[in-house]
Amino acid sequence: MNENEKKITLIPPPELVQYVGGHFEEVGKEFMQYFIEIGNLKSNETVLDVGCGIGRMAVPLMNYLSDDGTYYGFDLFTKGITWCKNNISTCRNNFHFEHVDIYNQFYNPDGKEDASQYKFPYEDESFDFIFLTSVFTHLLPKELEHYVREIARVLKKDGRCFITFFLINPESSYYLNAGLSPLGFYHQIDNCYVLNKDIPNFAVAYLEEDIRTLLNKYGLEMQTPPHYGSWCGRTEHTSYQDIILTQKISER
């Protein structure tokens, strides 16, 4: 995008903003900075937003991705995708949105698609940069592994993937066991820990070592130590959730 062009500022109506918990503009700007500083995002890259919601990340990307860059996003929230198509794609024709009818007990209880079998609607090795913000924090193990497999499939060689998690490690375990964590991941289901055993997808945490092993299984390597979040009560943090940056290694 030309520097002299007017910056685009879009904010969805309040009833849609509630879907992502508010703070639409602030969180979008925060993660735009992380994508550049942590993810090394370039303005001419092809980007995939898994779980794009109501465009909270797409809106700031409108002012960063050039005409040589391309954005794709998909989500299970119909109204969010409709708003994005009507307000974002009409301004930037290199921004593409797709609705997917994936079942989620909390967000889409009537969905017809199984998240653990859903094939991303893109060709192999299509993307330079993929990001998932507050997506793996809602997926159970079978679903999560399938998504990692699909990410590895559609990511270009040497492409990067930026993911947020709730990671269980010695430090976060200390806060959890001491009752200091605002989020209580005390219910274990398979290889994960959930906040609400009756609605497990509401919030899901994973052992950091298990995530590292899973990523490596599909040829994704963590590029830096995780950037830990404040969710468990730690005082030194980057964001709210934990951030991991992975890269698809050329030779496995």
Regions of interest found by a model, annotated:
Residues S134-V135:
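Short catalytic micro-motifs in class I SAM-dependent methyltransferases
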Residues N44-G53:
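Conserved class I S-adenosyl-L-methionine
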Residues S66, L139-L140, L155-K156:
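Helix-to-beta-strand junctions that scaffold the AdoMet/dcAdoMet cofactor pocket
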Residues F131:
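A conserved beta-strand element that flanks and buttresses the S-adenosyl-L-methionine
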Residues E145-K157:
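A short glycine-rich, Lys/Arg-flanked "PGG" loop and its adjoining helix->strand segment in the class I
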Residues M1-I38, I54-L61, T70-K119, R160-R252:
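Class I (Rossmann-like) S-adenosyl-L-methionine-dependent methyltransferase catalytic domain
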Residues D128:
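Conserved acidic residues
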